[in-house]
């Protein structure tokens, strides 16, 4: 540094202190300085102190009072000496060897260092004893260099007396050290985002610790804590580590917040350490393997303390009462062991020699027979105990009754009453003192490949009672023990009854006979007490089964199989040592102990058994390796978040932080002190916001849906997970399946069946199937995963099958386009939008549009192409109207449309939703937006929530359809549904001439939703169905609506296309897999011809509603039940 201090820098710092000095001194603001700036200031003070800075509060030596620089320096010195909080940032361009002295800060309470190496800091020794908060980011590699050596001061280790918060997150710490012994008052410790693999016993010295954050490290076990800090610790964060168990958490009785998300917790049995956390309020387990299990929340609830389960937030959501009550149905209840000194042993008869392998490895607690409490024999006379009981005051007996009732209610919840009468009846002393024999055990298998001596379980000697007065067991204790035993027997029975049902499906699908093997670990049997098991292979799993009970001991997924090796290993069998086949299987698993499994084959013909296993496992291995190679190739593809373009990353844009880099020993914090200069960008738009492209679904997932205009591929059997089926539907209820693929068809819960009507192949199908009725048609069904239902390139614009009916939610790409290209007003904010067919007054046809509403305007953007890529490519803004010019807002007939009228020459629009729920929700959103306008504009808007039916209404002539009925001004009952219609005529051999098909007279283009198009509405015409008491009408409407002529209908606005009496209906067909489709068969007895109305609605509820409307008049006509035909496909 030059000897002359930069005057401008000093003036700028003095100006900042003048303006914000009061907030800096009271602690509401933190003084943040770059290290070069602080170095300039300290050198200025060193020049003004010829003898060097002192220890206490100081003033500058005598100087001319009229010198402005001196007065400015004195002011800065006074401010810095009183500053309580300081933040030092070391720029990346500055050298690493850069001394920074903090001697001017005499009153420092909080210090934060960013990217400043500790050895460059001077003066920490003079303030360490008064520091309360110390924070170091991206600069520390060991605790000792800061806490024990005080950075560059290299002082001797002295205690930090008042330091209560230490934040060393985002550093390169690999282990802890003994310097933590100097932090006697520490309450908050944050060591997250480091590389710590183990904590050892260094945290035991922190007796005042209340908050501990060790997230984003490499811990494999819960850190050890002392008795002092376990009593005070209330928050423990261990997320993003490698924990495989919760052992050690049981010693934290006051813990309230526990975060174990994104670890390696595989089974719920590993949560046993949570049972003693009676004060737990928040628990996070998201991202663990057990998180993805079925009934995850209920299974987790059974491992929580019953005192805390009612108030626990599991993954941010409160446990419901049903989840807590149903937890008992998924396994035995995890209970705390009694803390008394009495030793638990079995004293009720003969002991069994050993236990089976199933009992040892099954995740359940020992049954009651193995945990009967040792009681000293009572030698008191029965009359004595009765005399003592009779001599007790009535108040004392009543108090004990209340305590016993409270204990029942606390332990068993709402169901405690069902246990009490039964258990109190068993409290007879003769029944209590009667010896109980253990329940019968299943006999072991009569044959075994090797004789293994069974070891008897040691019986601990019962300890003497702690007090001679405790010889008599109180009735309350007997009642509680009987309640526990009864509850355990009940839960065990539920578990035993449920397991065979769950395992039956897996065992039933075995591909080979059981093979007797011995699981080997480190050259020895994995379970010495019962070394051999049955090995079975199914289509998806490798099963280890208990040979005694036939239960599944271990289940491994074969899709994670990565390697197979066979060899010979010496093995001692029946006292003779011989070489037996050794089968080694490698699996892809996050747990190291599950990556490799070894089996010694002990069958009578081991070579033949190994050959059978290899024949089954090798094809699975080849499939797994092939899929892994394909997925690795997909990992090289990148995707742009802005334009969604996919490309291959051929430019080295710098290191990518990934779990693989950690396993290879890469430093994720390398380059913390330098700027990132990677040049990886999107080749299409140049954006730097790129991610790894999502992998293409394989295996059992469905392939994307082909475009509607494309022809189905010839000879394609639907490989790759596509389950395509062709069905022939006759007038019968059941349809015959002509082609199926049961192995590749997804389950009903995983896929949705979409329906489409094949109009092009209709003539060919009729020519080929001359024996079938011409009334039937050809249909194609396609199974498709729900996530890829719409052919919109992943866009979700409400309303849609995969989105909610909250029109305020919008795809982020469309939201960005609206904010940048459409909304241009001052303080204009987006409110809601809907994709809907729009009809503008004066236009002939309807068109698809996105209607976007802000707090100032309504925008109409026409959809001109396929929804994909940049919104500007398929959206064309056509008009915008101010909300203040809105004059009328009316809901259409029976809530199927919404009419907007604007004052002046603004025109009118009809939003033809054809869905009551969509219209109702969007109308509510519109009212919420209009409520934000000033009151003077709201008074000018005419609103109506339903369209009135008067004699001037356009549909009134069709409603008075009963011949001879008197004219009435009261609107009759009717059903009105805008839908899509397709007519199918059937030629009868008795008819004089065939009926003309109406398809040629109807337009082939419509605005049906993608869901309706997939179900066959591509060739249907947009009409309106009107159902009265006697007839059905198909009406063609132009939906033109002019606000100024609300009560005067436009001429020729409604034309009747077809009219049919309800009595002509012969059958009605519904389809479970095509809920928008309805098929009505008609038969005209006068003309002796048959026809069919094929209808598609935009609301699945409307099809059932149409059927119910037709039921009453049809049954009144024929006096028989009206039963629609429902097709399962």
Curated annotation (Swiss-Prot):
Q: What is its main location?
A: cytoplasm
Renumbered ranges of LRR repeats: 107-128, 130-150, 162-183, 185-206, 208-229, 232-253, 254-275, 279-300
GO cellular component assignments: cytoplasm
Which stretches does UniProt call biased (Low complexity)?
448-458
Region annotated Disordered, chain positions: 335-392, 428-475, 654-678, 696-724
- Where is this chain compositionally biased, Basic residues type? 365-374
- Composition bias type Pro residues, residue spans: 436-447
Compositional bias, Polar residues, is annotated for 337-355
PROSITE patterns given for it?
Answer: LRR (PS51450)
- Which UniProt key words apply to this protein? Cytoplasm, Leucine-rich repeat, Repeat
Stretches assigned to coiled coil: none
- Give the compositionally biased regions (Basic and acidic residues): 381-391
Q: Which Gene3D superfamilies does its entry note? A: Ribonuclease Inhibitor
Q: Which Pfam families match?
A: LIP1 (PF15904), LRR_4 (PF12799), PH_S11IP (PF25357)
Where's it found, cell-wise?
Answer: Cytoplasm
PANTHER family referenced in this protein's UniProt entry, alphabetically: NISCHARIN RELATED (PTHR15454), SERINE_THREONINE-PROTEIN KINASE 11-INTERACTING PROTEIN (PTHR15454:SF69)
Family from the record: Belongs to the STK11IP family.
Protein's UniProt name: Serine/threonine-protein kinase 11-interacting protein
